[in-house]
Every structure is written in structure tokens, then in C-alpha cells.
């Protein structure tokens, strides 16, 4: 199915793997910032 097909986007800092989940995109392996504390 289309939801199982991997999607790879090449960015200046590297590649990001994700999936097209029929209506929204899900990205994997993107580093996230730490939550604000205080």
C-alpha cells in the first residue's frame, strides 16, 4: 500500500525518512529540541 512505501527527502544536512500516510506525512529520525524548562 502507499502508506507502507518509504519516503526519503534529502535536505542540506542529510536525509530524512518518512511515510505518506494518506493525508499526513510522518517523519522519522528528526532530532527534536529539548523542552523549555523554568
From Swiss-Prot:
Catalytic activity annotation: a carboxylic ester + H2O = an alcohol + a carboxylate + H(+)
Keywords of this entry: Hydrolase, Serine esterase
EC number: 3.1.1.1
InterPro entries in UniProt: AB_hydrolase_fold
Ranges for region Disordered: 1-38
Domain of life from the UniProt record: Eukaryota
GO molecular function, a single term: carboxylesterase activity
Family: Belongs to the type-B carboxylesterase/lipase family.
Protein name: Esterase-5
Organism: Drosophila mojavensis (Fruit fly)
Record gene name: Est-5
Amino acid at each position: 500500500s502507499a502508506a507502507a512505501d518509504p519516503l526519503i527527502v534529502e535536505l542540506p544536512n542529510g536525509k530524512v525518512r518518512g511515510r505518506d500516510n494518506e493525508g499526513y506525512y510522518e517523519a522519522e529520525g528528526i532530532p527534536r529540541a529539548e523542552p523549555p524548562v523554568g
